[in-house]
């Protein structure tokens, strides 16, 4: 499954549009709380374990979106957008959403 942030696929013809597809994942309260605690503790460095959790959440959302597109008969998703948003009563969870347009190209 080809995923791209652009509205076209260079050198390819889009033959069918299937519509909007999306995938979501939520990082639980403890991971999110620990994430910000780790950020406060880091000075001039990177929090590898927290980046790993965010990367995994992003990949899960992209896979869910891709699977949805494949079930529709698409072989690509164009105009892919990733959003990160706090959710929950006190904003204690992080939701990662991937969305785009499912298409078939040749």
From Swiss-Prot:
Pfam families, A to Z: YbjQ_1
InterPro entries for the chain: UPF0145_dom_sf (IPR035439), UPF0145_YbjQ-like (IPR002765)
HAMAP family according to UniProt: UPF0145
The family this protein is said to belong to: Belongs to the UPF0145 family.
Listed name of the protein: UPF0145 protein BDI_2732
Organism: Parabacteroides distasonis (strain ATCC 8503 / DSM 20701 / CIP 104284 / JCM 5825 / NCTC 11152)
